[in-house]
């Protein structure tokens, strides 16, 4: 009895009698109290929420996500946890600083230790400290990195895919033991030197960088251009044509090799955080023990490119998804004519077209990675995904910029970066034209290469 009296007293202290008197002149208080008493807990909670908001319940909007078909729910709990771990890192560590570094064309080296803690480098490789996860997980990681910034995803792709991949697929056991553990921990940085100033798509038959055997060493001469990570790499995978048999071979070039020179490339409009370099090799001496022992022709080089081309398709998805999600978020906050622009028909049409492309791309690359995990991936599979995803990404980022109006070209709204970086994705790891010829050869039975 005493406790009930105490509760009644506490309730009485909080009653505003003047307000209650004014209210009783407008409504039948006993009737209201009876109606409120019949409400269940959920109904009462809803009523209180409405009262606290001044009688106007705030509209709860759907979450901002580009995963409209919930593809991530097909992942195992372990893989889903890793995906969210990478996403958190990118949103908390990269998003706040990315525009400044992009504008200054510098790389944020301070993030490398935290990136290493994610333990995702060399994600599909077995041994040497590598995680030995699926190709699907590798694709998911590439997408999550590119969803915030394509440059960081490209840096990672060069290190984990092209550089480490060349050693993992084509190196001797001694070479793997020497390089892969340190590269996996991001203590040793790698680069991949294939493209040349006058040779891009025609690398299979047109490399001008030469390698001349001289006893137990090789002499390398030539130039490489657009080489990501080149300005700070500890080891560079250099592809050169053997002057004796005319076959392409791979070499592990150490950064302190005499005759090696690298200059940072400036004035890029895309992937500005990536440190691309122009490499000059002048009588660089490389030991036979530093030649990739299983890289005997360009067919072996193509094995590396096939593996990484699938990752670039995922990267395109991430770029498109990031642009779409920023655009969607913007349109729900930006008001014109008294309401969010997301409420207008034409804006919704653009958003749906963007989402359609992002969803189609995601389902395509998901199947692509399944083929890779099943050992069924062919050149034409990866090439088709690269063609389709890079094209659709261009369309998505264009519409994302469009719905933002003039603000779409400001870095602070993020989409401008994606617009620029989509152009780089469109070109590297095989142009649309080269990849189209690869797919065309597969479906027609005729090669149109000249």
What kind of feature is each model-predicted range?
Residues 198-202, 226-229, 241-242, 268-275:
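Short Gly/Pro-enriched turn/cap motifs at secondary-structure boundaries
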Residues 277-303:
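A short, charged helix-loop
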Residues 217, 221-262:
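A short core secondary-structure module
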Residues 1-147, 158, 170-175, 182, ...:
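Alpha-helical interface subdomain recognition
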Residues 206, 256-287:
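Flexible, small-/acidic-enriched active-site or ligand-binding loops
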């Amino acid at each position: 009895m005493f406790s009930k009296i105490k509760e009644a007293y506490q309730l009485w202290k909080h009653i505003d009698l003047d307000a209650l008197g004014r209210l009783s002149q407008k409504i039948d208080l006993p009737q209201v109290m009876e109606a409120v008493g019949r409400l269940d807990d959920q109904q009462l909670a809803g009523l209180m929420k409405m009262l606290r908001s001044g009688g106007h319940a705030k509209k709860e909007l759907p979450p901002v996500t580009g995963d409209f078909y919930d593809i991530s729910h097909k992942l195992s709990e372990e893989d889903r946890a890793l995906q969210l771990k990478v996403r958190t890192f990118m949103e908390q560590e990269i998003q706040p600083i990315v525009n400044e570094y992009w504008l200054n064309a510098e790389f944020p080296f301070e993030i490398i230790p935290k990136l290493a803690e994610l333990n995702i480098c060399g994600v599909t490789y077995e041994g040497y400290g590598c995680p030995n996860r699926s190709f699907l997980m590798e694709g998911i990681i590439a997408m999550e990195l590119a969803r915030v910034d394509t440059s960081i995803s490209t840096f990672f792709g060069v290190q984990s895919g092209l550089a480490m991949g060349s050693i993992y697929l084509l190196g001797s056991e001694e070479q793997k033991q020497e390089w892969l553990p340190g590269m996996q921990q991001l203590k040793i940085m790698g680069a991949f030197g294939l493209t040349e100033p006058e040779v891009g798509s025609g690398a299979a038959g047109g490399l001008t960088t030469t390698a001349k055997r001289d006893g137990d060493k090789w002499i390398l001469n030539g130039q490489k251009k657009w080489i990501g990570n080149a300005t700070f790499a500890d080891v560079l995978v250099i592809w050169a044509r053997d002057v004796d048999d005319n076959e392409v071979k791979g070499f592990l070039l150490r950064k302190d090799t005499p005759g090696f020179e690298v200059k940072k490339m400036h004035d890029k409009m895309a992937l500005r955080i990536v440190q691309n370099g122009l490499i000059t090799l002048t009588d660089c001496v490389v030991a036979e023990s530093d030649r990739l022992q299983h890289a005997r022709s360009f067919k072996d080089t193509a094995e590396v490119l096939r593996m990484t081309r699938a990752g670039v398709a995922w990267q395109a998805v991430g770029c498109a998804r990031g642009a779409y999600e920023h655009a969607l978020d913007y349109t729900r906050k930006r008001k014109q004519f008294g309401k969010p622009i997301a409420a207008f028909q034409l804006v919704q049409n653009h958003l749906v077209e963007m989402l359609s492309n992002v969803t189609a791309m995601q389902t395509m690359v998901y199947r692509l990675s399944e083929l890779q995990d099943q050992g069924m991936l062919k050149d034409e599979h990866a090439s088709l995904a690269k063609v389709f995803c890079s094209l659709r990404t261009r369309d998505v980022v264009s519409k994302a910029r469009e719905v933002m109006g003039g603000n779409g070209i400001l870095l602070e709204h993020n989409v401008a970066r994606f617009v620029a970086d989509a152009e780089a994705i469109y070109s590297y790891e095989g142009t649309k034209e080269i990849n189209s010829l690869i797919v065309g050869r597969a479906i027609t039975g005729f090669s149109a290469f000249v």
